[in-house]
């Protein structure tokens, strides 16, 4: 049996008539009848008997159907795969990003890109640095955008921006709001400690160690977001990435850079053996502009 024979046989068997099969296949009834006749001629036996206006499968057809159905399901799978490949011509962006970019930078980039290319599909999830490699290897994402990533085997890092750690503090803490601060100026303030904060935490503690700074802390949290929200409630001072700080500004809090600055890279990671699509390249440019 040819593939067309299988398609027509399956349609007639499951719908019960040539009329319904033609509708399901979006072809004419004579076309279905012709293909059925050709299939029966090649097989050397009848597949259906006409009984009171309906086509009833013969015993041979019923024996054949289970195998035909397996092939038909495979054909459907191939068709769906082909549709997905066709859809990728418009573009699919499977993206994992560090949560801080979700405040403004990522929504800004997606909105601008979607306006220009409305047929590109986005699938976005948040990720932490220690999850990036596994997410890429398991193809949960094509691209992971994180802060200051460590070198990973088989992974290429593309620097798309540079940012910095900043202090977030209540405005009442200083008579005039400084544009820059030193760690010495924060001594004595209640410090919100952010545990397990990855490479940015290492960057911060390295500087504090170099300057022999110890900040008093009675509150320890796991995320920059919670730390920033605590400051917004008037509790202490925290040091977070600039994106989290800007995303949580309010009338009563301010931010300041450090002197000297605590810079870090924003990098996009992808597997070395996988070439980025043109849509991903274009989106990275948009994201870089929004950052």
UniProtKB/Swiss-Prot annotation:
Keywords: Activator, DNA-binding, Transcription, Transcription regulation. Residues 1-58 form the HTH lysR-type domain. Transmembrane segments: none annotated. Induction: Expression is up-regulated in the presence of D-glutamate. Residues 18-37 bind DNA. The keyword RNA-binding does not apply. InterPro entries: LysR_subst-bd, Tscrpt_reg_HTH_LysR, WH-like_DNA-bd_sf, WH_DNA-bd_sf. Disruption phenotype: The growth of the deletion mutant is significantly reduced with D-glutamate as the sole nitrogen source. Belongs to the LysR transcriptional regulatory family. Transcriptional regulator that positively regulates the expression of the D-Glu gene cluster (DGC). The cluster includes dgcN and dgcA, which are involved in a deamination-independent D-glutamate degradation pathway, dgcR itself, dgcT, dgcP and dgcH. Acts by binding the consensus sequence upstream of dgcR, dgcT, dgcP and dgcH. This is HTH-type transcriptional regulator DgcR.
């Amino acid at each position: 049996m040819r593939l067309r024979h299988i398609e027509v046989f399956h349609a007639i068997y499951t719908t019960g008539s040539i009329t319904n099969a033609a509708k399901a296949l979006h072809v004419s009834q004579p076309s279905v009848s012709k293909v059925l006749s050709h299939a029966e001629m090649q097989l050397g036996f009848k597949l259906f008997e006409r009984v009171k206006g309906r086509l009833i499968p013969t015993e041979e057809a019923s024996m054949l159907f289970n195998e035909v159905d397996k092939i038909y399901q495979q054909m459907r799978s191939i068709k769906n795969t082909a549709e997905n490949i066709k859809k990728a011509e418009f573009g699919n962006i499977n993206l994992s990003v560090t949560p801080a970019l979700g405040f403004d930078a990522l929504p800004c980039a997606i909105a601008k890109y979607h306006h220009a290319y409305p047929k590109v599909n986005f699938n976005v999830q948040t990720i932490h640095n220690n999850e990036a490699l596994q997410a890429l290897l398991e193809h949960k994402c094509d691209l992971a955008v994180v802060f200051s990533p460590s070198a990973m085997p088989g992974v290429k890092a593309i620097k798309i921006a540079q940012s910095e750690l900043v202090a977030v503090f209540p405005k009442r803490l200083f008579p005039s709001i400084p544009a820059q601060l030193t760690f010495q100026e924060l001594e004595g303030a209640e410090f919100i400690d952010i545990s397990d904060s990855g490479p940015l935490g290492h960057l911060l503690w390295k500087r504090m160690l170099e300057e022999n700074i110890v900040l008093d802390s009675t509150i320890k949290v796991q995320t920059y977001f919670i730390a920033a929200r605590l400051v917004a409630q008037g509790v202490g001072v925290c040091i977070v990435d600039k994106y989290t700080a800007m995303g949580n500004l309010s009338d009563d809090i301010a931010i300041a850079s450090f002197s000297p600055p605590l810079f870090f890279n924003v990098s996009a990671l992808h597997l070395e053996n996988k070439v980025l699509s043109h849509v991903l390249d274009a989106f990275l440019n948009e994201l870089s502009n929004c950052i």
